Amino acid sequence: MEGEELIYHNIINEILVGYIKYYINDISEHELSPYQQQIKKILTYYDECLNKQVTITFSLTSAQEIKTQFTGVVTELFKDLINWGRICGFIVFSAKMAKYCKDANNHLESTVITTAYNFMKHNLLPWMISHGGQEEFLAFSLHSDIYSVIFNIKYFLSKFCNHMFFRSCVQLLRNCNLI
């Protein structure tokens, strides 16, 4: 890798891969860079809000299923707009899917990381760079308020449920007056 490609690789590793590896316990908190420790705070908050709303379960037994389901959900999430809040939801969703694979001992967490990395590189990175890159993402993570987090979590859940056709998930969202 050279020049611009290396810069992009480093951005994705700082924002996405580091958090996923931390989330699935492949690295400890003290192994995170100072930047990663800062964004971990907002991502952990997104994760906590998401966990309060619904339990996301997966049925993944092959690399192809992971790629298909993952790409379907995140394509739906970003089909009409990219913003930092949705990117946070994307990262947390990626981490949850990787953790599921690791906990299921199916050794497919690397497929999730690779699929998420490629999606971010090809679909999100140009937007991220044109909107301030790592610095703006950090600013967003430091200054997000509870309402923007909840709004983005509700939006993510509605897209997740729409794509995955989880009737029980949709019903839960309705019962909680979230959609």
From Swiss-Prot:
A motif (BH1) lies at residues 76-95. A motif (BH2) lies at residues 126-141. It is found in: Host mitochondrion; Host endoplasmic reticulum. GO terms for molecular function: BH domain binding. The keyword Lipoprotein does not apply. GO terms for cellular component: host cell endoplasmic reticulum; host cell mitochondrion. Suppresses apoptosis in host cell to promote the viral replication. Has the ability to potentially bind to all the members of the proapoptotic Bcl-2 family. Inhibits autophagy by interacting with host Beclin 1 (BECN1). This is Apoptosis regulator Bcl-2 homolog.
